[in-house]
A protein has these predicted regions:
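Structural motif
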Residues: 25, 52-54, 92-96, 138, ...
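Signal for well-folded cores of large energy- and translation-related assemblies
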Residues: 43, 85-89, 116, 120-127, ...
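Active-site beta-strand/loop microenvironment that shapes enzyme catalytic pockets
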Residues: 77-125
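C-terminal regulatory domains involved in ligand/effector binding and gene-expression control
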Residues: 1-75, 198-202
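Terminal, non-globular segments
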Residues: 173, 179-182
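Conserved short beta-strand edge segments in small beta-sheet-based binding/regulatory domains
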Residues: 159-165, 191-202
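Short glycine-/aliphatic-rich beta-strand segments at the starts of folded cytosolic domains
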Residues: 127-143, 171-173
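Short amphipathic alpha-helix segments
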Residues: 140-157
Length: 202
């Protein structure tokens, strides 16, 4: 699988359940540092809220995730939020749900339903985009090999990320993961035939 889904921009949803108010916010993120920054902002903005719960998912393989109940009964907040993320197969996303207690206890089952529904309120208005997993390949070659190297670029259509055309030339190419083996194979074959280029993958 070399595609994944994430959201384009932050979005928000609000849910009221038995006088408790749930404010859900979803953010596109790619690092733990970004997540910490968003959480700090939310905790400061909603300092008077009873609970600030969250869940996140990172990486195109969707293996880096966490759910936090922030004082709610175990498993009643973070996991339902994560469930809303999983049901949409999203990644590189943080969802925060703030709860203002309305005086009526919701019970364990009620909390699970409410937190998942609140997260869904935000995610239902999110603009979702499908992205490709791209890999990069460095090609080092002598200047006289320029035509052969660029012919492969034209035919395979990778994105040229960086280029340096001195006596010792270098191209950094980016291409969808599923197409990388063919691109690499073509340059390795050219290297075998000429001995005047070499390839390296990041």
């Amino acid at each position: 699988m070399d595609t994944y889904k994430t959201i384009v921009a932050p979005c928000e949803g609000i849910l009221t359940e038995k006088r408790s108010k749930f404010i859900a916010m979803a953010f596109p993120v790619t690092t733990l540092e970004e997540i910490k920054e968003h959480l700090a902002v939310c905790q400061k903005k909603y300092f008077d809220a009873r609970h600030v719960c969250y869940a996140y998912m990172l990486g195109h393989e969707r293996t880096n995730f966490r759910a936090n109940d922030n004082g709610e009964p175990s498993g009643t907040a973070g996991r339902p939020i994560l469930g809303a993320i999983n049901s949409r197969e999203l990644t590189d996303i943080l969802v925060v749900v703030v709860r203002y207690f309305g005086g009526i206890k919701l019970g364990t089952g009620g909390l699970i339903v409410a937190y998942k529904a609140a997260a869904a309120e935000a995610l239902d208005v999110a603009e979702v985009v499908e992205k490709t997993v791209d890999l990069t390949l460095d090609v080092y070659f002598e200047y006289p090999m320029m035509n052969e190297v660029m012919r492969i670029v034209k035919e395979e259509e990778p994105t040229v990320v960086e280029q340096d055309f001195q006596m010792d030339c270098r191209l950094r190419l980016s291409i969808r993961a599923s197409r990388m083996p063919r691109l690499r194979e073509r340059y390795e074959q050219l290297a075998l035939e000429t001995g005047r280029i070499r390839v390296g993958e990041e």
